[in-house]
Every structure is written in structure tokens, then in C-alpha cells.
Curated annotation (Swiss-Prot):
It catalyses: ATP + H2O = ADP + phosphate + H(+). This is Eukaryotic initiation factor 4A. It holds the Pfam family Helicase_C. Residues 249-410 form the Helicase C-terminal domain.
Length: 410
């Protein structure tokens, strides 16, 4: 699979590296090289430390060692690290350290691309700030506007949300921006893509001119970095080069499948062979989610499914069942990949390969969370060879053929 580029390969890694190098050599960033190897050495409030340790953290991850303190100092930051390395706790800690808890007004706004991810951030923020008495609320689509207005009127310190609902709350003046001093974009590559870019600008225009901005993502294409220049002031750059994006701890394999129609049999064979704690299966369309779910259930496999056409309440119930372990197999699409944070996921299967190399990391980063071992298996037809080639070049990894002893790896 790692030979010459297949005909029609779209990804130009030389052009990517050239654009990235141009941006990184410009006098746009502030250098910051301090590393804190323990949470105790970061100068954090005692009650924040209590929340961090109660959450289960013992030692800061690499991004936390470098990223929490500059954010706590009020500096603009751009931080890039692999999914599952503690980015969320990095900016949550930075926000919680700086809040004025005597002022029950929104002081920090966090935007995420999906409802599930926004709700996940809300949970982390609330857990880390448990001993501080933080008031945090998620403003997301698919929930009651009136309830959002009621909670915001009663007073919150932090709002986490999706761009559409947050902009609506600002426009209705239910969310007052006067005291917002911190603005965070999570999964910024997605947030700064064409779909969200205009909404982000519209929201930013309504915020105070003097505001701290944090940009966090697993991947940071040059286009996203260029956009950040419009609303950041000499940010601290904690940026991993593309060839340093680690997928360490996640073993990656491919299975050659001659025909699309044979994927289903291959998948069912795998599930009959392997003892799996929990797994996520990715396909590329909502219709395919429904189709594959029906096919697997008809063969007596217990699976759950979630996609953007389902109402929010149904998706919440399904994700709760999956997190609790009562459901062990989840079929979903890229849209919801970023809201899945389940520690026990040991296997990700790309039934369909992602159309963009950047999405590969977001998908397989669902396994091997926080240093645990994980396995990713990619179903590859002849039409998919170009995508696998692009992924290998993009992340500087080798995807090997699935060995016969795959059961020993899980």
C-alpha cells in the first residue's frame, strides 16, 4: 500500500508543508517554551487542583504540560495535539483558573462544531470546576430555546455551545457579551471550515474587543491558521508538525476487499472472531448508517447507531448507553466522530474510509484514548487505495495488512 501514488491522488504533501512553513516563519507568534511536569507546579487554585485530581488526572499530558500555564496567563494560544491527549482539560483548566466566581455573568465562551462535543466539554468543565462552584451551560441546537434563556437569565460563568444556537442567544440578547473575556474554538479545523467560518466571524463581531482567544484542534491545516490571524494577537504556538502527529498506541491495519458488497460479510466475520470491549464503526453517509445497522441486526449482532438526522434526545440516549457499556458497538458518521469520548473503545473500523485525510485522525483517535492501546481496521476496495496512500503520507505512518492473529492485539 505504501508504493507509488495511485492515479488521481489529490493530497499534495509538498504544497501543504510549504504553506505551513510560510506561516510558521512569519512574525506572528509569541514563543513560550516552559514545561510544567506536574499540576502542582502550575500555580493553580487549590480547589481547581482538587477537581483535576478528582477527575482522575495524575500527571499532565504533553499538551497540558505546555498549554495550561500560558492560557492561565491570559495569552492567546493555538494548541494542536492528537485526540485523546487532554486538550479539553487544558482549556477548561485555563478558563476555570481565571473566572471571577463572585460575578455570575458569562465570562467565557467555548464553541464546538457538534452538540455532542459541546455537551462533553460542559461535563468536563463542570467536573473540573466542581469545588469552585462553577456555573456552566451548553447552548446547542435541538434543545429548548426558552430553557436556554431561563438558565442564562439566572446567571452562568461559562457558556459552551454550537455556533448557530450561541449566535441566536447573542442576537436575542439572552446571552450578554459585556463580561466575556475568554473565547475558545475547539476542533478549530472544523470550526474554521467553510460551513462555520461566517458564523464564527458574526459571533466574534459581537464580543468585546479586548478578549483572550484560544484555538484548539487535533489537525491544523494552513488555511485554518491563516484565518486565525484575523482575530488573534501574537498567540503562543504549541503546534505539532504534521509528521509529528502521533498515533502512538494505535495499531493500524487494512483489509483488501475486492467488492463493496463483500464488506458486510467481512465485518460480521470479524465480530464473530474477536472479543471486543467496545468499538465504533464509521461510514460516510447517514443512509449507510441505517442500512448497516439493519443488516447487522438481521444477523443477530447487537449494535447502536447515531447520526445527524436523529433527534437530540434519541442521540443522547444512545450515547449514554454506549458510554455505560450496555451497548458495545456504535455505527456513526464523521459528523459525530468528535463527540465520542469513551475510554473503553479498543477498536475503530473504517467500513468506509474518510474522504479527507484530516478526518482519519479524528476517527481512529476514538480508540487508544489517554494512552490506552487501540486498533484501527480499514476496509479498502480498489477505489480506496488513493485515500490510504494519502493518509500514510499525511501522517507519515504505515498501514499494514491485517494479520491472522488480530485477536491477540485487542
Amino acid at each position: 500500500m505504501a508504493g507509488l501514488a495511485p492515479e488521481g491522488s489529490q493530497f499534495d504533501d509538498k504544497q501543504y508543508d510549504k504553506k505551513m512553513q510560510e506561516i510558521l516563519t512569519e512574525d506572528f507568534f509569541t514563543s513560550y517554551d516552559d514545561v510544567c511536569e506536574s499540576f502542582d507546579s502550575m500555580g493553580l487554585q487549590e480547589n481547581l487542583l482538587r477537581g483535576i485530581y478528582a477527575y482522575g488526572f495524575e500527571k499532565p499530558s504533553a499538551i497540558q504540560q505546555r498549554g495550561i500555564v500560558p492560557f492561565c496567563k491570559g495569552l492567546d494560544v493555538i494548541q494542536q495535539a492528537q485526540s485523546g491527549t487532554g486538550k479539553t482539560a487544558t482549556f477548561c483548566s485555563g478558563i476555570l483558573q481565571q473566572l471571577d466566581y463572585g460575578l455570575v455573568e458569562c465570562q467565557a465562551l467555548v464553541l464546538a462544531p457538534t452538540r455532542e462535543l459541546a455537551q462533553q466539554i460542559e461535563k468536563v468543565m463542570r467536573a473540573l470546576g466542581d469545588y469552585l462552584g462553577v456555573k456552566v451551560h451548553a447552548c446547542v441546537g435541538g434543545t429548548s430555546v426558552r430553557e436556554d434563556q431561563r438558565i442564562l437569565a439566572s446567571g452562568v460563568h461559562v457558556v459552551v455551545g454550537t455556533p448557530g444556537r450561541v449566535f441566536d442567544m447573542l442576537r436575542r440578547q439572552s446571552l450578554r457579551p459585556d463580561n466575556i473575556k475568554m473565547f475558545v474554538l475547539d476542533e478549530a479545523d472544523e470550526m474554521l471550515s467553510r460551513g462555520f467560518k461566517d458564523q464564527i466571524y458574526d459571533i466574534f463581531q459581537l464580543l468585546p474587543s479586548k478578549i483572550q482567544v484560544g484555538v484548539f484542534s487535533a489537525t491544523m491545516p494552513p488555511e485554518a491558521l491563516e484565518i486565525t490571524r484575523k482575530f488573534m494577537n501574537k498567540p503562543v504556538r504549541i503546534l505539532v508538525k504534521r509528521d509529528e502527529l502521533t498515533l502512538e498506541g494505535i495499531k493500524q491495519f487494512y483489509v483488501n476487499i475486492d467488492k463493496e458488497d463483500w464488506k458486510l460479510d467481512t465485518l460480521c466475520d470479524l465480530y464473530e472472531t474477536l472479543a471486543i470491549t467496545q468499538s465504533v464503526i464509521f461510514v460516510n453517509t447517514r443512509r449507510k448508517v441505517d442500512w448497516l445497522t439493519d443488516k447487522m441486526r438481521s444477523r443477530d449482532h447487537t449494535v447502536s447507531a447515531t447520526h445527524g438526522d436523529m433527534d437530540q434526545n434519541t442521540r443522547d440516549i444512545i450515547m449514554r448507553e454506549f458510554r455505560s457499556g450496555s451497548s458495545r458497538v456504535l455505527i456513526t458518521t464523521d459528523l459525530l466522530a468528535r463527540g465520542i469520548d469513551v475510554q473503553q473503545v479498543s477498536l475503530v473500523i473504517n467500513y468506509d474510509l474518510p474522504t479527507q485525510p484530516e478526518n482519519y485522525l479524528h476517527r481512529i483517535g476514538r480508540s487508544g484514548r489517554f494512552g490506552r492501546k487501540g486498533v484501527a481496521i480499514n476496509f479498502v476496495t480498489r477505489d480506496d487505495e488513493r485515500i490510504v496512500f494519502d493518509v500514510q503520507r499525511f501522517y507519515n505512518v504505515t498501514v499494514e495488512e491485517l494479520p491472522a492473529n488480530v485477536a491477540d492485539l485487542l
